[in-house]
Amino acid sequence: MAIAENYEDVLKGKYPAKAHAKKVAEWIIAKGGDKNGTIYLEAQKQKLNEDNDGEAPFRQRRYFFYLSGCELPDSYLTYEIATEKLTLFIPPVEPDEVIWSGLPMSPEDAKAKYDIDHCLTTKDVNAHLTSTSESAQSTIYAIPEQVSDHVTFISYKEKEFKQLKPAIEYCRVTKSDYEIALIRKANMISTAAHEAVMKAASTAKNECELEAVFLKACVERNAKNQAYHSIVAAGEHAATLHYVHNAAPISDQNLLLLDAGCEVDCYASDITRTFPLKGKFTAESLAIYKIVLDMQHQCINALKEGVVWDSVHELAHKVAIKGLLELGILKGDAEEIFTKRISVAFFPHGLGHYLGMDTHDTGGNANYADKDVMFRYLRTRGSLPERSVITVEPGVYFCRFIIEPYLKDEEKKKYIDESVLERYWSVGGVRIEDNVLVTKNGFENLTPTPKEIDDITKLILST
């Protein structure tokens, strides 16, 4: 059976906060940290919108959530490394707030819900910190600028602000069964939303209508937060990688690119599908779609523990070059085109990134200053560990802003046939993106959203 395949059963348990805390502590100790230290983290504070009394949208601080599983704002936690005790501090009852919002979660309720040893109120935090520092503990680990002014570490011998954040970022790369279950659930809900958009596409008059269809499908499944701003791009708008206007009329455009995903309990999905709005590809859009689908299939099939992501990214470019040569858009020697980075004109972004609590999750070690343009925007570098989740999102785009400088360059333009290229501008762009779990000997694709040509066209035409 696949890992966390029955995700609803897995999610009946508690989020594994203590296992995460122990994992982080072990990383700190392995780097020479204090085995008698204490970890301290704070939740995001509830804030008001500027110049009015309305609450700003709340997004839990991911570092805090990773060691608590707690979605409550204005909370704190401590983890005593030697005793492995995890203590959560939640806001006390404020009578004025109860009038408006009802009774908050009690410490008893929190103890039952979360994977913690103790739960106190935030009023108790300084007394608790003093008591732990007076025992064997000597070092407090925290994240700079994420400690409230009234919280004091004065009784600790050492205050360490450099190790905790990278420790959590490293540990977040490899996922527990519970985390994989959350990502699976987010993918299932987002798949239903993508399918709803495909079914509604043929009658839509504006991109915003289809964005609304996606959001409705998520919210009615109790996924009220999106992992990122949806991209709903018809026709040539899809040539813009992060097009977010989602408000243009839909008329005679052939393709729609939908890059959208909900989150479930702070864990993201990130799915892209490109499909013909009326259910039928043009010859040009079909040719490009087949290239991108081949890019994705080959790259996913290359995944397993230890594979070097840079090499998989190179594979995507080589598949793209082969396909564009066959269409006549590119001309010349494939190896020469690869070496001179001509394919970057059509595939300018990285193949994918780690996925977890953030859409672009931690631990990727990107190098945005890389002088090699092929790798500059590759958000994940190096080898992929078992239980990491990576997006695989190849694309081919016809963006005038990106391609035209190549056409004006005497050395580069000889590899591009402008007369053939002219037929493809209207395609805009094609991207296909799945969320893939890396396993010891291969992979598990967590994204069941239709993408094969027959599957998507039948779905669109079924309405």
UniProtKB/Swiss-Prot annotation:
UniProt GO molecular function: manganese ion binding; metalloaminopeptidase activity
InterPro entries, per the entry: Aminopep_P_N, Creatin/AminoP/Spt16_N, Creatinase/aminopeptidase-like, Pept_M24, X-Pro_dipept-like
Residues involved in Mn(2+) 1 binding: 270, 393, 433
Catalysed reactions, as listed in the record: Release of any N-terminal amino acid, including proline, that is linked to proline, even from a dipeptide or tripeptide
Broad class of enzyme this protein falls into: hydrolase
BP GO terms, sorted: proteolysis
Entry keywords, A to Z: Aminopeptidase, Hydrolase, Manganese, Metal-binding, Metalloprotease, Protease
Cofactor(s), names only, from the UniProt record: Mn(2+)
EC annotation from Swiss-Prot or TrEMBL: 3.4.11.9
Pfam family, one: AMP_N
Binding residue positions for Mn(2+) 2: 259, 270, 433
Bound cofactor: record note: Binds 2 manganese ions per subunit.
Function: Catalyzes the removal of a penultimate prolyl residue from the N-termini of peptides.
Recorded family membership: Belongs to the peptidase M24B family.
Protein name: Probable Xaa-Pro aminopeptidase pepP
Native organism taxonomy: Eukaryota, Fungi, Dikarya, Ascomycota, Pezizomycotina
